[in-house]
Regions:
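Alpha-helical membrane-protein topology signature
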Residues: 1-194
């Protein structure tokens, strides 16, 4: 029961983070990186689907479903509002790996292998945002990134509470926890003089 409560709190935190992020984007306080967000739109749905099949537990995967919907909304909303940054070559690499993971899942019917392969484009997808925020910490505000991190921390606790002797179920939320927290930490830095 407590795992369902933690999962629910994680989803609420996730949704609140998306609302805050989209408001900041409209005010020009956050600049969604086109590479990162376009890869997320393509990859998070597959990530969610493979995680559901891999873990066999929808409660563990609910945050990924919320993230998939939130990423898709944010991408198209920022695209419509003209707030996305320009694309760069990292997109192609991550998308190719994502398509490869899709093929692995389809061909071998192995969701676990596909989900582990998907962790590579997930990391790659964050790199453009990391590069942008390292250059200019004002590209992002820390709050939504820390809220997303907190949501993934709760998801890690949910996975542990619903343990099924599948340690790979932890890889995805741990990956997301550190990737999101890193953006939040870089967003808190003051801009370095040129």
């Amino acid at each position: 029961m407590i795992s369902v409560v933690l999962s629910s709190i994680a989803i609420i935190g996730h949704v609140i983070a998306f609302v805050i992020y989209n408001k900041q984007m409209l005010k020009g306080e956050s600049r969604p990186n086109a590479a990162t967000w376009s890869i997320w739109v393509l990859g998070v749905g597959l990530n969610c689907a493979t995680y559901i099949v891999m873990s066999g537990d929808i409660i563990k995967a609910l945050i990924l479903l919320a993230g998939s919907l939130g990423c898709t909304w944010t991408f198209f909303f920022s695209l419509f509002k003209g707030k996305l940054t320009r694309l760069n070559p990292w997109d192609i690499v991550a998308m190719i790996i994502g398509f490869f993971a899709s093929f692995v899942w389809w061909h071998y019917r192995n969701a676990t292998m596909a989900n582990m392969i998907l962790q590579i484009p997930i990391v790659i997808s964050f790199l453009p945002t990391y590069r942008g925020i390292i250059r200019n910490p004002r590209n992002e505000k820390a709050l939504p990134w820390f809220l997303w991190s907190g949501a993934y921390l709760l998801t890690i606790f949910t996975v542990i509470l619903r343990w099924q002797d599948k340690p790979l179920d932890l890889v995805n939320p741990i990956n997301y926890l550190f990737l999101h927290a890193g953006i939040g930490l870089f967003a808190q830095r003051k801009k370095l003089p040129s």
